[in-house]
């Protein structure tokens, strides 16, 4: 029984006004498909344990003026995917990584090409795979680019670039539409959620308090502040339906890796406040 994300494909997303007429159809067929899928698998017992990880990386550019987002995520992902394909043609057993687009145009995601099994040998492969993927990514960057292990870019929304705000997609006064991945899904997702709400996203992260703090929250007005967080996600194929109902990874999760956004400190340092 699988737990995790879906494969991202290219298509024509419907604008919100066009999508509204199809909501009832989508909901009903979604329920029907879920029931059929559930019935096919509800009696499975002792299914093979398979698992994998998804790692999201943020790409940043360094200059004498400081750090900024490097909006080359799609370009870097295409380069890495082409390199994997070339390796696979030359040496079939190589090319062990799949690269995926992510919400931010400064982001790239990697997964192992094939899932790990429950055997010890595969457990030992996890760290080496993560190291190998990061090494491949770094080799695709320019000399002035870095990809550190951080969840959120602290300067996002601080106007440290010349890109126009209030774009037609996010309509944000803090971040430009350029930070959204050019894949059609992400722009449509951003615009449709805003149009469905009738207003911009309203993010309020609790502000760290000290003697000189004014205000209680850090405000943001775009999905990029949450969807732009880089995370490690784990996908499991569970042995049966009962096991798949419970998130067994919860005791292992740690969330205090987002100490600041918009250059001020968050009270609890958790990226969930930005989603």
Give the role of each language-model region:
Residues 2-275:
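Phosphate/nucleotide-binding catalytic core
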């Amino acid at each position: 029984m699988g737990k995790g994300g879906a494969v991202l494909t290219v298509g024509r997303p419907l604008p919100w006004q066009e999508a509204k007429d199809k909501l009832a159809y989508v909901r009903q067929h979604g329920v029907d498909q879920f029931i059929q899928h559930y019935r096919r698998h509800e009696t499975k017992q002792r299914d093979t344990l398979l698992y994998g990880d998804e790692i999201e990386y943020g790409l940043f550019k360094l200059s004498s003026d400081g750090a900024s987002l490097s909006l080359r995520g799609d370009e870097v992902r295409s380069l890495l995917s082409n390199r994997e394909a070339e390796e696979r043609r030359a040496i079939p057993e190589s090319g062990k990584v799949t690269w995926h687009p992510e919400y931010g145009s400064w982001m790239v995601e990697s997964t192992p090409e094939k899932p790990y099994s429950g055997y010890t040998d595969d457990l030992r492969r996890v760290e080496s795979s993560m190291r190998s993927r990061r090494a491949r990514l770094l080799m695709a960057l320019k000399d002035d680019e870095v990809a550190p292990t951080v969840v959120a870019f602290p300067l996002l929304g601080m106007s440290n670039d010349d890109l126009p705000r209030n774009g037609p997609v996010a309509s944000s006064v803090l971040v430009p539409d350029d930070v959204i991945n050019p894949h059609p899904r992400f722009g449509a997702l951003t615009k449709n959620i805003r149009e469905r709400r009738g207003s911009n996203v309203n993010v309020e992260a609790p502000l760290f308090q000290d003697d000189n703090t004014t205000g209680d929250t850090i405000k943001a007005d775009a999905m990029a502040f949450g969807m732009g967080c880089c995370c490690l996600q784990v996908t499991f194929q569970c042995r049966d339906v009962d096991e798949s109902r419970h998130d067994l990874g919860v005791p292992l999760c740690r969330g205090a890796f987002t100490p600041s956004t918009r250059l001020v400190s968050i009270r609890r340092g958790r990226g969930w406040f930005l989603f």
